[in-house]
Amino acid sequence: MVIQWFPGHMAKARRQVTEKLKLIDVVIELVDARLPLSSRNPMIDEIITHKPRLVVLNKADMADDRLTKQWIAYFKEKGHMAISINAQAGQGMKEIAAACKVLVKEKFDKMVAKGIRPRAIRALIVGIPNVGKSTLINKLAKKNIAKTGDRPGVTTAQQWIKVGKEMELLDTPGILWPKFEDQLVGLRLATTGAIKDSILNLQDVAVYALRFMEKHYPERLKERYNLNEIPEDIVELFDAIGKNRGCLMGGGMIDYDKTSELVLRELRGGKLGKMTFETPEEFGEQVEDVEKIEEV
């Protein structure tokens, strides 16, 4: 399954982000804690270059806590300050502000030394669609400023938002890359809802999600769908889930589309518990002594 989705406003956003960088003190890169690397646009590294960066793992309430700690350690080893948050619940907002102050301290100290009065920190928020940028901005600003939704592509225009007297945020539309050459990355993004369902084959996505859970979270899969054992044959697994949850067509036939929608809706809604779809080890990174590494 090759996924292509690159609306015109995303291409425009890349140009605008590049233009705005000279105004920015720090970049807040928002990723999905359930897939911290797959939810990063590789173009971001090219665009941001040498700006101080804070990597924020959002939706930590839906991710595997043990793996979230490993990912924070991973980003720190790469030289990026990193924290985990739950923007929906407003958790981690103070940590973001504190981390940004640390990242711009050297620059602002130089400004003061030159007799320049410190101004508000100017931060750029970047990320792919549906990682929670608008929700984060609204929580930081304590106002319903940015449009929010669980559909990718909700934020379509750039805007400056004041966060108290100490910070100004520039929101940007989510920037996806033109084509997912890595099929696994595309499937992971599709599973968490970062890509519009309307352009996907949901059965393919559901097959990936079920096989992933079978391998990594089998007990949750069995408990949620009342399975004594998980059938090896994927069609039999769909049949068992569809029958258990009443996803039927006329004559008692299993409705595979409805079953696929059910599985993905429940997974995205947290009904199957906290889970993370990738680990640093998969990318050749060994993260040691994670428990000793404290978050910022």
UniProtKB/Swiss-Prot annotation:
Its main location: cytoplasm. It holds the Pfam family MMR_HSR1. Gene3D superfamilies: 1.10.1580.10, P-loop containing nucleotide triphosphate hydrolases (3.40.50.300). Signal peptide: none annotated. Keywords: Cytoplasm, GTP-binding, Hydrolase, Nucleotide-binding, Ribosome biogenesis, RNA-binding. It is found in: Cytoplasm. GTP binds at residues 58-61, 130-135, 174. Coiled coil: none annotated. InterPro entries: G_CP_dom, GTP-bd, GTP-bd_ortho_bundle_sf, GTP-bd_ribosome_bgen, GTPase_MTG1, P-loop_NTPase. One of its GO terms (biological process) is translation. Residues 14-178 form the CP-type G domain. One of its GO terms (molecular function) is RNA binding. SUPFAM superfamilies: P-loop containing nucleoside triphosphate hydrolases. One of its GO terms (cellular component) is cytoplasm. Belongs to the TRAFAC class YlqF/YawG GTPase family. MTG1 subfamily. Interacts with ctc. Interacts with the immature 50S ribosome subunit. 2 molecules of rbgA bind to one 50S subunit. Essential protein that is required for a late step of 50S ribosomal subunit assembly. Has GTPase activity that is stimulated by interaction with the immature 50S ribosome subunit. Binds to the 23S rRNA. Required for the association of ribosomal proteins rplP and rpmA with the large subunit. This is Ribosome biogenesis GTPase A. It comes from Bacillus cereus (strain ATCC 14579 / DSM 31 / CCUG 7414 / JCM 2152 / NBRC 15305 / NCIMB 9373 / NCTC 2599 / NRRL B-3711). The lineage of its organism: Bacteria, Bacillati, Bacillota, Bacilli, Bacillales. The gene is rbgA.
